[in-house]
């Protein structure tokens, strides 16, 4: 299955929008909203977010191969700006996203499920788990299938990814 940059960017935008709505309404996610949040994959492989995308004239500086991502990138920045309390918070969100472009690659659920199954088959059922780079929590979810009462501590340094994790 090929990595569809445009679809991944769309999925991320919808997940961010959903997280901001949940924050604003101070409530837990519905089943449908959880599904949207779980499609969030971070911005690894989406270097387009490093390009300027404030106004239409910025598009002339984009590579031709990335132009189809210009409008969604503008939408992403607008969404973050509209949901930031001030320019400082907006800049922190964007800086966090940009810092993750080279590092935010998420492990597919099929792999985390297999790892959890192998550990369980070997009678490894942790009472405590530390997830230092949690993303949207796929390792935690997989491990909790076999150790539902485990005490979990999950961290995520990317600010927007951390919001996804908090709502999952």
Pin down the residues of each PLM region:
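Class I S-adenosyl-L-methionine-dependent methyltransferase catalytic core
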Residues: 1-168
């Amino acid at each position: 299955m090929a990595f569809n940059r445009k679809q991944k960017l769309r999925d991320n935008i919808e997940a961010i929008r959903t997280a901001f709505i949940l924050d604003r309404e101070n409530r837990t996610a519905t089943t449908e909203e959880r599904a949207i949040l779980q499609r969030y994959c971070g911005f690894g492989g989406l270097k387009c977010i490093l390009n300027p995308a404030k106004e239409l004239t910025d598009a002339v500086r984009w590579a031709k191969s990335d132009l189809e991502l210009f409008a969604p990138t503008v939408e992403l920045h607008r969404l973050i700006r509209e949901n930031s309390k001030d320019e400082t918070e907006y800049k922190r969100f964007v800086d966090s996203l940009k810092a993750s472009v080279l590092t935010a690659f998420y492990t597919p659920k099929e792999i985390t499920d297999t790892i959890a199954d192998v550990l369980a088959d070997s009678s490894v059922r942790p009472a405590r788990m530390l997830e230092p780079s949690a993303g949207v929590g796929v390792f935690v979810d997989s491990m909790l299938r076999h150790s539902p009462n485990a005490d979990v501590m999950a961290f995520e340094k990317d600010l927007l990814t951390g919001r996804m994790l908090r709502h999952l």
